[in-house]
Amino acid sequence: MNLTPREKDKLLIAMAAIVARKRLERGVKLNHPEAIALITDFVVEGARDGRPVAELMEAGAHVVTRAQVMQGIAEMIHDVQVEATFPDGTKLVTVHAPIR
């Protein structure tokens, strides 16, 4: 199987999001990369489903809560920017203050 670098990145993010979900199920607080992966995966999958950019920007800020991350992680993440593929092309989605 030959994957482009972009496809490899998407698979890595999807796998990291799976690991993060399993850790949340066990009650383990997420670290920085895990929180980013969950938010990114949510946006990418929402884009593939055809959800509008504005909706993903708003909903992406409710994927991970302060109670689900390690101390100080929420303050470290100011914005999450995701280049996602929508039915009408690739767009940049920015989730401001993604952990509330």
Curated annotation (Swiss-Prot):
Reaction catalyzed: urea + 2 H2O + H(+) = hydrogencarbonate + 2 NH4(+)
- Provide the gene name from the record: ureA
Q: Which organism is it from?
A: Mesorhizobium japonicum (strain LMG 29417 / CECT 9101 / MAFF 303099) (Mesorhizobium loti (strain MAFF 303099))
Pathway in which the depicted protein is active: Nitrogen metabolism; urea degradation; CO(2) and NH(3) from urea (urease route): step 1/1
InterPro entries membership: Urease_gamma, Urease_gamma/gamma-beta_su, Urease_gamma_sf, Urease_subunit
Pfam families attached here?
Answer: Urease_gamma
The protein's assembly and partners: Heterotrimer of UreA (gamma), UreB (beta) and UreC (alpha) subunits. Three heterotrimers associate to form the active enzyme.
User: Which protein is depicted?
Assistant: Urease subunit gamma
Give this protein's Gene Ontology molecular function annotations.
nickel cation binding; urease activity
Predominant localisation class: cytoplasm
Where does this polypeptide localize? Cytoplasm
A cellular component term (GO) from this record?
A: cytoplasm
Question: Family per UniProt?
Answer: Belongs to the urease gamma subunit family.
Identify the keywords attached in UniProt to this record, alphabetized: Cytoplasm, Hydrolase
What are its E.C. numbers? Answer: 3.5.1.5
**Gene Ontology process terms (BP):** urea catabolic process
